Amino acid sequence: FAVLYLATYITTRFIKRGLKKFFEEDKKEMPKLPNKSISLILSIIVSMITSNMLIEKTMLALNGAYFGVNDPVFNVDIGYYMFQKPFIEALIIYFIGLMVLYTIYIAAYYIISFNKYFEKGIDPATLKKNTFVKQIITNIVLIILAVSAITIVKVQDVVCGKFLNLSNGISLYGAGLIDVTIKVWGYRIFAVIISVCAIMAIRNFKKENFKKVIGWLSTIPIYLIALFLVILIFDLVYINKNELDK
């Protein structure tokens, strides 16, 4: 709760600092805008919704155990997948959700303030240089980096996935040859590509170079298609040919 309150309070301070420039440009006295009250209310609501999930994952991680047996793919103790990994995933997902919420909050605060106090509208040039745009872009970059992080963590799920169904109905779980060779490194590279392409697209968007924005963003689906084709070809040519002998 304390962390949420502090984060909301600081975010609102930056919002008020950005709005102050519009009031100064319009030669208006800036009214007293809500901060402490709205920070308290938002923090209470978010804490009530998310506290149970975080407490459960935290207690699971703190009370975890090590089995002394490492998986052959990542050389990590089996206990990590049962106790620490769910906690790490929960933290990243929580962070993404929080950044999305704050992005909506920032946009809503500005829009409501603009509609209430600036009947004549605002200068687009001032808006582009304002803290508002910087806050939104910063949050988007943080969300992108968090998505990359969760992608890297989720790659480890190949160890627990189903990879073979036997004729007697029994399913075997673990990592197949494609999983440990192509998928692991393919998705690790994909996480890096997401970050680089998204950040470069944002930079070019700020420069209004929209052709490069499309170029950088199109790299992501192109890479996914290429990865799918590599997996398909590898499966047809190498795995299906004689998987048991490999």
Give, region by region, the residue ranges found by the protein language model.
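Contiguous transmembrane helix-bundle modules in multi-pass membrane proteins
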Residues: F1-V76, K85, E89-K246
